[in-house]
Amino acid sequence: MPGNTYRPGGRGSDLWIRAGFGTQRAERRARLRRNFFRMIQEKLRNVAIIAHVDHGKTTLVDALLKQSGVYRENQEIVDRVMDSNDLERERGITIMAKNTAVTYGDTKINIVDTPGHADFGGEVERILKMVNGVILLVDAAEGPMPQTRFVLSRALELGHRVIVVVNKIDRPDQRIYEVIDEVLELLIDLNATDDQLDSPMLFCSARDGRCGYNPEEIGDDLKPLFDTILDYIPAPDVDVDAPFQMLVSSSDYNEFVGRIAVGRIERGTLKQNQEIVVCNYHDPDQVSKKAKATAIYEFDGLNRIPVDTVTAGNIIAMSGIGDITIGDTICAPDAVEPLEFDKISAPTIEMTFSVNDSPFAGREGKYVTSRQIRDRLMRETLKDVSLRVTEVEGSDSALNVAGRGEMHLSILIETMRREGYEFQVSPPRVLLKEIDGQKCEPMERLVVDVPSDCAGSVIEKIGSRKGDFLDMAPLGTTRSKLTFLVPARGLFGYRNEFLTDTKGEGIMASVFDSYAPYRGELSRRNVGALVASETGESVTYGLYNAQSRGTLFIGAGVPVYEGMVIGQTPKKEDIAINACKRKQLTNTRAAGSDDALRLIPPKQMSLEQCLEFLDDDEVLEVTPETLRIRKRILNLEQRMKSIHRK
């Protein structure tokens, strides 16, 4: 009798079905399979958290992970666990989108923590394709900011449902009810549907892991948020019986398995080692590439868990496909149908990376050659599709690197610096476009939050940088929110000036808006540089007279070379300074005269400040230990001749 028992896939099963005896049983199996996968989909939610920088996205994910039981009782819990690299933790920003999953009751919730800075918006646009709804996180004091608008507009265009969470309601300067009005105005302004305007609203303190439906009475945990996700965000609407199809929305790179594709399965089922085909909607002439899914992973808490089979609606990662890019479609060989996707926004800012050729070249770096720098930049493009690296015409030691903004490129520079690379970079420059025969430049929507008595100064400074003043709104009784449309190049070097004008109390944020006709020449900075005229070691005597002419960037005992920028001066002209000048030795000494020389502590320049300070005739020397601003032409006489020739 055991030999007569039907076994799916067993010997003789095909004969059994062809004879008609197993048809009914096979149909029943297929029906049970569909019901089983439909039940799995009903217990699945895909959601992204979007907000502006430092509004608490990663902190909220931390709290969701803790309260869903991801951590063991004896496991050490790290704050902001989703910010996995040192730069993310130090700066308090998320750079690369992260995936995680929690289980609440019997429902699996895939959560994506997206970047909040506009420069990493290339990450956000792709991630929204993977989810069915979003959590819009807004600071109870700052309200919606430019990046909030940028991401929310794309989420609404995709028809996603929105859960509004007002965070940091325990801030002393919170203005909850004004922020609620601002969120509703933003939704109306972005043409949200009636259903989207009726979004549920919760009030939260992510730091304490508490939220509720009323700002006056919030609970002791995040249960209201979990319940709202289950009730309001729809389960994926997909077909598990159709041929396999998945759009690659994100990617990772591992030295052992190579490129890892991440995305949501749109339809069908995928098994380990299954044959697949890669195609692209925007490249229909491309020959489809055949591959094999050698490894499949689901997200579970903070980990990727290897699995044998995955079904439609789930967010997964897979390896085994060598050359794959964001926007590619992975599908079954018998149904090659590429999925449509919006191309990632093009870079707007470019810098030139080249071999360090200063007098101190090679002293501090581990990787200093053009080949090593080129290989590192090319590896970065495998992980960051918003980055573009191209050759510099006529040079074999320089590369043009284009990104979404100054922070995007500064993160790359800082990462390479920490890895031991030594190189030099040019000042950032905007990428111009020709539209209908007219030269156009990228424009930024700038929003600033400033003390009301500083508003006039800020408006005047932005106007001098060819910006347009769009709107002004009060924030309480002492602060104002100003909105501008300004050329991207008009913001180069402005942040330090802005902090000075607002006495350190201003907050500024910008996001790419559009391309507009070129607005003419614009000075990069309004101050001059103090430039070393000799090579050697700086001494107190040489710097003492220099500090009366401006602000120093270095102190005594620092190696300098001719052409190195050692400070700034209020005048627009550069001033040559001999920082190595020593006091002439004589037989006459006044008691205590040497002790009277006191230097003002030098201004410590961060990487972003150095990039903002750079003028067109300067470059930034980057080493693992030091940042040095220098003139392209080091010798003073040659530099003056070059200026006169112009």
Where is each model-derived feature located?
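P-loop NTPase switch module centered on the Walker A-proximal segment
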Residues: 35-138, 142, 182, 251-254
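Canonical P-loop GTPase G-domain recognition
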Residues: 172-230
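Accessory interaction regions appended to the cores of large information-processing enzymes
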Residues: 198-200, 220, 227-231, 258-261, ...
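Alpha-helical scaffold elements adjacent to nucleotide-binding pockets in ATP/GTP-utilizing enzyme cores
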Residues: 63-64, 101, 123-126, 130, ...
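Residue-level signature of catalytic and energy-coupling elements of molecular machines
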Residues: 54, 60, 92, 111-113, ...
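Conserved Switch II/interswitch segment of TRAFAC-class P-loop GTPases
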Residues: 117-120, 129-149, 160-177
